[in-house]
Amino acid sequence: YLGYSATSISFKFVGTKATAEIVSDASKHTEKERAWIAIYYGQDRDPAKRLRLEQDRQTIVLFETQQTTEQQITIVKYSEAEYAACGIVSIEITDEVNPGEEILLSPPVHKKRQIEFFGDSITCGYGVEGDVSDEIFDTADENPTKSYSLLTAELLNAEPNLVSWNGKGVITAYIGEEEDAQIDDSWLMPMLYEYTDAGLERDYFANEQSDWETWNFEEYKPQLVVIYLGTNDASYTRDIPDRQKQFEDAYVKLLHQVHEHNPNAAIITTIGAMDQRLNTTIDAATACFAKVTPDCTIRYVQLPLQDEVDGLGTYWHPTEKTNRKCARLIADAAKEMLQW
């Protein structure tokens, strides 16, 4: 299953055609909540195909040509984990010029540099292709390749892994400004971090939490973890000192959680493009953690507030232009920290 934004699968083959049987839960979602995937060929920067999964089970032609050729194909999930699921049942390769002579080649090699991005909607690329005038969010406007996360990885020639969910935070989910600030801690990022895909387990398989697959931190070891959380928490803290302290303590605890699972990884904490009310709090939490954890290389990176001149995405989310500015700042910090 392709769960979080930008989750992908790549393969190489020799033949004329490749198809994939894909499952989803499209029938349980509105059109604007359905899953989107993109198909890339070789090292192309732009996808050859981009499509919405309209059925609960369908066969998709990934690639087709008239002559036998060697091709690398990558399927990338563009929509995020909160919405419709995407599972690959099977991939079939054929050679219609030389029947039976299709060849599945060794898979592409992973990049040496690995970065994990732990965040919310901004990390997903939520609404990055939409407009602030949009009244309803559409997964069609979600594109992680235009988020600071994948843009940062591109600048650093690194392979990204996203753990991101829109509207969720460290101590609370987003609370509308017109609502009473009652904390919503039913589905938070520290909990999600422990599982491979909690959303899939809960919403698609309807499994009990005790049966959810936990993430294998021994198998995946990034050199850097970038944490961009706090924007949703600010909807609750609202510059109230006691709430800011509550958030700071929880953020320090989160840093210990991430470091415990990734003891050899450097950490960058960051915030600021959409909301700056917790900037100093996250900076302070980072400093507090660093003081008691000298074995961890960690740095806070302040991001500038988005400028309307650069456009505004759906529900005031950052545009690609804003995300590129953020990516450059984070990439520059990573280069200094890791000598990349």
Question: Model regions: which residues?
Answer:
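Structural recognition of the beta-strand scaffold that forms the well-ordered cores
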Residues: 114-118, 123, 160-164, 223-228, ...
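Aromatic/hydrophobic pocket-lining residues that form the small-molecule binding cavity
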Residues: 247, 251, 323
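Conserved SGNH/GDSL esterase-like catalytic core that processes O-acyl groups on lipids
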Residues: 4-6, 134-241, 245, 273-282, ...
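N-terminal secretory targeting modules
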Residues: 1-118, 122-144
